[in-house]
Structure formats: structure tokens, C-alpha cells
Curated annotation (Swiss-Prot):
Disordered: annotated segments: 68-121
GO terms for MF: 3'-5' DNA helicase activity; ATP binding; ATP hydrolysis activity; DNA binding
Function statement: May be involved in the generation of recombinogenic substrates for the subsequent action of RecA.
Similarity comment: family membership: Belongs to the helicase family. UvrD subfamily.
PROSITE patterns hit by this protein: UVRD_HELICASE_ATP_BIND, UVRD_HELICASE_CTER
Protein name: Putative ATP-dependent DNA helicase YjcD
CDD domains membership: DEXQc_UvrD (cd17932), SF1_C_UvrD (cd18807)
Length: 759
């Protein structure tokens, strides 16, 4: 049905602003929508495959209702002196001034993506000559048996990389008689290490004692062991800053010593930048400082290093550089390890950073039995110092090296693999190769077009619900997004549903972000001018130190006024500060009755919050900017009519952040976190320019550097190849309150698109 009754008014979808469909959806959930013919409760159906329509809450056939709701030409035109805004009728010339609505957008039927090439089934039987229980294809067998000299194995997504690594190690031990203790197998996660050991014991029949003798571990664990054996007092594990909060404490102390309010500097980003400098192994005096943010972080870096030295402590990044320096200073020690590790296997080679690679090269000499397994198309960790150039230049570093391509994908269907391949082939800096699926399927990737982030989340959850009702398990699904803020709406929608889910901590903490807390503080303070927590978050935006909080508490008592009004009575304020605060204080009462999005816009402009954001300058976080958070919170605020209702929602979601316990169900995660995982059904959110690819990569590309843009394309490739059977790519028409353009990475797919998908 295309019509329903809301608040004694008939709603016709064909004349109703698409912007407000999400509002109608939520009104239906609350029981406020009714059939305009029979009067029974109805819902607005918003899903991926079908046009939006009203459906009765109770299942059944309602032909009379459907017939009554067929659109009829209106005999009376709309009154000229009125215009509509959602369900509110406004006098002509008047509008809600807070945030102009984007243009009405028609619903577009989703499109299916045609495979770039026809599926060609492979009839080659797997080879079981090495291990009867483990079949290997021709290329895998080559990678397993090519044991001498430098070898690069380019293992495409889902091509059996772990099988090759474990089979190779088992073959060398069982069939070639190589002592396990002479083998070094290095990867990036303890989970991968455990999985490889388990496979070697269970699938290949290696004796547990032999498996234990293989030196396996992460880069960090390997470097720690080497350092500990060289100087156990200095490199004792008790001196390691294992936890993130320990490192953050030193940065916070450094901020204090520099006279910087810790609420004004993203500690996590400072630590990430410091880690990047360490992992690229640039001497301190030669670190290029590009802007004021990096200059500030460099000063924090110096404080951080000094504090660690004073306490004889070290962090994970220190171990790599220290190990490298140890081998430079102690060639005799390096020679001992070279004699010990005559065969080296490196997993996820595309993620290696400069220091790690230098150490592995040193250990591999002079035998050069170095086997590196990776995929240049999955290099997505530039922010950690990794660089695809190491895998791309392997032949230059080792001119006699052999290269083996693993291009058979056993995870995903042909339509998914073909689509992902079309996307990544637009990159220039990569090995020329074509990934091929081992199986076909009639299900093809789907592009769908929600109005905005809110409708996007509703459509995805509706689709998941429908699939679960048809027998799917919640664990079959993953929802992927570029940055944590991109998962905010889907997190909220799943929280409101009965579907079990698990989410990254980052997406759960949206309402705890610094900028979000600060802008919301204006709204909280408007409702309660003695809200200490809100005022604490307001102070930085008013360019006041946290020490002012206690003064405000005292003044509110001695002057018999609210803490907000006490702001204008603070002593020792500079004249410009006093003038500004006197101007702002009365505005809190004005905010009280505004709509939430109006209040946020008012605080931005009239109360100076946008000016504060500009003065803060570069936050150091290229991916999650404060201004982006501000746009995100306005998208949420639009859904609520009153500030108390909006803040109740915020409080509810903050409580949910603290109380989440589910470990199973639909997986919500960033694309980075999804790497190495696989799911039957994958939804990729926000495939629009500015999200995937991210704004910062578009900016650098405009300046002539396309490295970041190519990494963004690899990121989409990684997201697409997580899907085993169903892949959905979302292209919202609006993002963060502005019109969005579908991702430029999708253009090659759209050229291959079939006719619109029919449900």
C-alpha cells in the first residue's frame, strides 16, 4: 500500500519527501501508523529489494485496502499559501532554518552486478601425494615444494594461504628432514600462530613435540625473545608497557608538561603517529614534521621517550628497532641466529614495516631461504608503516627469487570474485594477476541506494531479519564500514532489534567521542545549568581550563546562581573572554526549547563552537575528524523533536556501550578489522566518495599522490572478498547531511551492471 494515516492525516508515499521515510518507519514501530481504509495498524517496509510500502502488522491479504490506496489524481491542488515539511504544515515562505533538507530523492531499485567474465569450471583434481588428507592445487604444490632460495608467494584472497604455509612447514620437516628448530615461521597475530600449530598437528600428523620445536610467533614475540636472551635485565617483561592505558598515561603526562589540555589532544592518534615514526625507522632529527599537529606530537614523543627511559621501560615498537640495532652492534650474535634459522617463512608479507623487513633480511643471510607469503592487493596498513613496495620490489631485493601466484579463490563465488577483481585491477602499482573463483552461483553482488545513513541501517537490518526468518543464522552476517563512525547507525538499529550482534569497541563509543560530548554538553547544560559533567566538557570550547570547574561550583554557591551563570563571574578573565562568555550565557536558555538539530546548529554558530573547532586546527586524525563527528550527530538529532527525547536516546546508547556482553551474532566491524575473516553474507556501508575512498585520499590524489587512493581501493577489495555467497554494497544518496556521489571505485562495476534487480 502506498498510503497510511498518521495523526489523522493521510500520508501518500508518492508525494511524501523521501527524507522522512525513516521517520515514518519509526512511527510505525511505535504503533502510530494506521491503514487509511480499515484502520488497522501498519508498518512502513524499508528493505533492500522492494519499493517502500505500508504493510499491515498482522499478516494476511488485504486487497480492499490496497485498492483503496492506489494513487488517484488530486482534484484540488495543494494550497498555494501552504507548503509541507514532513508531517508539519508550514506557512509559505517559512521553513525549519536549522538544517536545510536535501532535495527529494526517488527510490531506486537495486542493481545486480554482472560478472566481468564467464565462469570457467576447473576440473583438475587436487594433488594428495604429499599428504593424503590435504589436497593441493598445482600452484599450491609448487609453493609447498619450492624450498630453497628466496620465494615470493602471491596469495590472493581466499586462495589457501594458511594451507600452503602449514603444508610447506610439514613437508620440510617430514619429507626433507629439516630440523624443526631451524625453521622460523613469523606472522602478525597470536591467533594465526595458534591456528597454524593446530593444523600442523591435526591435519599433517606432525608429532606435537616437533610442532613445539618450530620457532613460531609474531614479530613482537620473536624480537622480545632475541632481546631478552641478549640482556634479560634490561628486556624483562615486567618493564614492557603491555597495555594501551600505560602508554596513554605517559602521553597525558607529557601533555600536562607541555601545558596542553588533554581534552584538546587525541592521545590515541599521538601514539599512532609515534608508532609510525618508529616503525619506519627514521632518526629523530630527520623526522619530517608536516604541520603544527606533527610538531606538537614530536614534542610529546620526546617527553614519552624520556619518561620510559627514566623508568627503564619499553613498548612494543621499541623491540623492533632495538633488535635491529642489536644485530648491527653485535654481528657475532646475528651470525648465531643466522645459523639457527636456515629457513624463514613470513606470513602476511604485505603488512610488514621497514624495520621488520630489515631484520628478516639480516636473519635470512647468507642462505637466503626466505619464503614470503602475501598479497599486494591486500596491503591496507600504511598508517602503521607497512608499504606494498616491499612486496612489489621483492625481485629487486632478491634478483634470483622465484614468484608463485595463488589465484584460485576457494572462499567466494565467481560473481563476487569477478567483481572484486574488476575493482582492484584499476590500481597501477600491483602485480598483474586475475583471481578466479572455484565455484559459481546465481547470486550476484547487489548495489542498493538508501536515502542516508539512517535508512541504510534500516534496510540492512530488515534484510538480515528476513534472511534469519528464512533459516539463516545471525553469525552468517557481517556489516563492514570504513571508519568507526560509519557504523553508528547500524549499531543503534541492531540494538533496537532482537537480533544478537557483536560490535567493535570503537563503534560502540560514538557518544563518548570528545567532539560529540562537547557539542552535546551545550544541550545538557540548556536543560540543567548545574550539570557538572556537561560543564566540564564545555570548558575547553569556552577556552577555559578544567581548574575553572571548582571555581564555578564555589561561585554558584556564594553568588546564588547556576554554574552556567557563574561563568560570567569567573575572576581573572581577559576582557575578550569575558565579553564572549557574557554573550553566550543567555543563549543556554534559548536552546532549551529548540529542536535538537536547531540547537546544535545554533551552538555551532551563535555560541562559537565552530570557531573553537577551527582554532583547534589539525586534530591529527585524518580519518575521524571532529567536524565529521559534528555532522554525524546532526544526522541523529534530526530524528527527534525535543532535546529531552534526544538526550534520553543518547543516555540509552551510552548505557548500552557499558552493558554490551554479546560475543556472537551479526558482526559489526571496520574493514580493517575484517581482514582475514569470512562471512556468508557481507554488507559494505557507505560506498560513496568521501567514505570509500576517504576524503583524505581524495585530497592527496588531487595533489598528485595516488598512493592513499590506491590503498582505499585495496580496502574495498578486502571488504568485497570477505563475502562467501552474498555481497551488498550500499550507496546512500546523502551522507552527513550532504548529497553524496557513489564511489568512483564502483564505476567499472556499473558499466557491467545488469538490468535492475527484480525481487
Amino acid at each position: 500500500m502506498k498510503c497510511a494515516r498518521l495523526n489523522d492525516r493521510i500520508i501518500h508515499l508518492h508525494t511524501y519527501s523521501r527524507e522522512h521515510y525513516q521517520f515514518l518507519f519509526e512511527e510505525g514501530i511505535k504503533g502510530h501508523l494506521f491503514c487509511s481504509h480499515c484502520g488497522k495498524p501498519v508498518l512502513l517496509r524499508l528493505n533492500i529489494a522492494d519499493p517502500p510500502e505500508f504493510i499491515h502488522r498482522q499478516p494476511g491479504d488485504f486487497p480492499a485496502c490496497e485498492e483503496a490506496c492506489e494513487p488517484k489524481p488530486s482534484k484540488e491542488g495543494k494550497k498555494e499559501d501552504d507548503q509541507e515539511s514532513g508531517v508539519i504544515r508550514l506557512p509559505k515562505g517559512k521553513a525549519i532554518a536549522a538544517d536545510p533538507s536535501p532535495a527529494v530523492t526517488e527510490w531506486h531499485r537495486p542493481r545486480s552486478i554482472k560478472p566481468g567474465t564467464p565462469f570457467v569450471p576447473k576440473t583438475i583434481e587436487p594433488d594428495t601425494s604429499l599428504f593424503p588428507s590435504v589436497g593441493l592445487n598445482t600452484d599450491q604444490l609448487k609453493a609447498v615444494t619450492e624450498t630453497e632460495g628466496p620465494l615470493l608467494v602471491l596469495a590472493g584472497a581466499g586462495s589457501g594461504k594458511t594451507r600452503v604455509l602449514t603444508a610447506r612447514a610439514a613437508h620440510m620437516i617430514e619429507h626433507l628432514g629439516i630440523p624443526p628448530e631451524n625453521m622460523l615461521l613469523v606472522t602478525f597475530t597470536t591467533k594465526a600462530v595458534a591456528e597454524m600449530k593446530e593444523r600442523m598437528a591435526n591435519q599433517y600428523g606432525l608429532q606435537p613435540a616437533k610442532v613445539r620445536r618450530i620457532v613460531t610467533g609474531t614479530f613482537h614475540s620473536l624480537f622480545y625473545k632475541i632481546l631478552y636472551h641478549s640482556n634479560s635485565a634490561k628486556w624483562n617483561g615486567e618493564h614492557l608497557l603491555k597495555m594501551e592505558w600505560q602508554r596513554e598515561q605517559y602521553i597525558k603526562k607529557a601533555l600536562y608538561e607541555e601545558g596542553i589540555d588533554e581534552k584538546e589532544s587525541p592521545v590515541d592518534q599521538a601514539l599512532q603517529q609515534i608508532g609510525f615514526w618508529k616503525n619506519t625507522y627514521v632518526p629523530n632529527e630527520r623526522i619530517p614534521l608536516k604541520d603544527e599537529w606533527e610538531k606538537q606530537v614530536y614534542r610529546l614523543y620526546e617527553h614519552y621517550e624520556r619518561q620510559k627511559k627514566e623508568h627503564s621501560q619499553f613498548d612494543f615498537d621499541d623491540m623492533a628497532s632495538a633488535c635491529y640495532e642489536l644485530f648491527i652492534e653485535r654481528p657475532d650474535l646475528l651470525e648465531q641466529y643466522q645459523s639457527r634459522f636456515t629457513y624463514i617463512l613470513i606470513d602476511e608479507f604485505q603488512d610488514i614495516n621497514p624495520v621488520q623487513y630489515k631484520i628478516m633480511q639480516m636473519l635470512a643471510s647468507p642462505e637466503q631461504n626466505l619464503c614470503c607469503v602475501g598479497d599486494d592487493d591486500q596491503s591496507i596498513y600504511a598508517f602503521r608503516g607497512s608499504n606494498p613496495s616491499f612486496i612489489l620490489d621483492f625481485q629487486k631485493d632478491y634478483p634470483g627469487a622465484k614468484t608463485i601466484y595463488l589465484t584460485a579463490n576457494y572462499r567466494s563465488t565467481h560473481p563476487i570474485v569477478s567483481s572484486a577483481d574488476i575493482v582492484v585491477k584499476k590500481n597501477k602499482n600491483r602485480y598483474a594477476k586475475t583471481l578466479e573463483a572455484a565455484r559459481d552461483d546465481i547470486q550476484v553482488p547487489v548495489l542498493f541506494y538508501p536515502y542516508d545513513e539512517e535508512e541504510e541501517a534500516t534496510m540492512v537490518v530488515s534484510d538480515i531479519k528476513e534472511k534469519i526468518q528464512n533459516g539463516a543464522s545471525p553469525e552468517d552476517f557481517a556489516v563492514l564500514y570504513r571508519t568507526n563512525s560509519g557504523g553508528r547507525a547500524i549499531y543503534e538499529r541492531l540494538h533496537q532489534s532482537s537480533i544478537p550482534y557483536t560490535a567493535d569497541r570503537g563503534v560502540q563509543s560514538f557518544y563518548s567521542r570528545r567532539i560529540v560530548r562537547q557539542i552535546l554538553a551545550y544541550l545538557y547544560a540548556s536543560q540543567n545549568e548545574d550539570d557538572t559533567e556537561a560543564i566540564k566538557h564545555l570548558l575547553p570550547a569556552l577556552f577555559l581550563k578544567q581548574s575553572a570547574l571548582n571555581t564555578l561550583k564555589a561561585l554558584s554557591i556564594t553568588e546564588d546562581c547556576t554554574m552556567i551563570k557563574a561563568l560570567a563571574k569567573l575572576p581573572d578573565l581577559k576582557p575578550f573572554q569575558l565579553d564572549k562568555i557574557k554573550k553566550i550565557v543567555p543563549f543556554f536558555a534559548s536552546l532549551r526549547t529548540m529542536k535538537p538539530v536547531e540547537a546544535i546548529t545554533f551552538a555551532e554558530g551563535k555560541m562559537g563552537f565552530s570557531e573553537y573547532l577551527k582554532k583547534r586546527g589539525n586534530e591529527g586524525n585524518k580519518l575521524e575528524k571532529g567536524s565529521d563527528d559534528l555532522r554525524d550527530i546532526k544526522v541523529v538529532a534530526k530524528k527527534f523533536k525535543t532535546i529531552p527525547d534526544f538526550l534520553a536516546h543518547v543516555d540509552h546508547m551510552r548505557a548500552a556501550e557499558k552493558n554490551r556482553t554479546d560475543e556472537h551474532g551479526v558482526q559489526l566491524m571496520t574493514i580493517h578489522r575484517s581482514k582475514g575473516l569470512e562471512f556468508k553474507t557481507v554488507y559494505v556501508l557507505g560506498t560513496v566518495d568521501g567514505s570509500i575512498p576517504h576524503d583524505f585520499s581524495l585530497e592527496t590524489a588531487r595533489k598528485g599522490d595516488e598512493a592513499a587512493l590506491e590503498e582505499e581501493r585495496r580496502l574495498l577489495y578486502v571488504a568485497m572478498t570477505r563475502a562467501k555467497q552474498h555481497l551488498y554494497l550500499s550507496c546512500p544518496a546523502n551522507r552527513r547531511g550532504k548529497t553524496a556521489n557513489r564511489s568512483r571505485f564502483l564505476y567499472p562495476l556499473l558499466q557491467k551492471a545488469r538490468q535492475p534487480l527484480h525481487h
